[in-house]
Amino acid sequence: LKPGDVLGLVGELGSGKTTLIQGLADGLGLDASAVRSPTFIVLREYPGRVPLIHIDGYRLEGAPSVVWLDVDWVFSSKKVTVIEWANQIEDCLPDDYLELQLSHKSVNQRLIRMIAHGARSRELVAGIGGVVHSPQSTVHKRAGQES
């Protein structure tokens, strides 16, 4: 990931959205243990070499509820932005973002479906194919946009 990337996470409660964001924070060199669900404050920023913005879209429930967010700041090219429950604020998302749909495969396994919305997101999906190392993990490409 690099500054300006936006990830939209979708999945039921307990599907691993916050845990995934903790892993992303660790990969960005941030303190992953500091990452918590932003449920009661809606947005958290984790400063670092590449700052991470973590938004909870669940409580925002649609575009009218997010007009108070400074969208230019949130989706700044100087930050990585990750939105839990991104489907709740789809109308506010930028044109280019990577949607990650999380679901339970088993008690300790998750299935992540990636849908690219834009050129940069397609680059991210293509790059992930080369870094998936788990023998249980697979990356499937469909229609040049979904994985």
Task: Spell out what each predicted region is.
Residues 54-61:
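Switch II (G3) loop of P-loop NTPases
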Residues 66-67, 72-147:
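Short phosphate-coordinating micro-motif centered on Lys-Gly-acidic
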Residues 30-45:
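Short beta-strand-centered segment that lines the nucleotide-binding/catalytic pocket of NTP-utilizing
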Residues 9:
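Hydrophobic anchor at the beta1->P-loop junction of P-loop NTPases
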Residues 13:
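The conserved Walker
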Residues 1-4:
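Phosphate-binding P-loop
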Residues 17:
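Conserved lysine of the Walker
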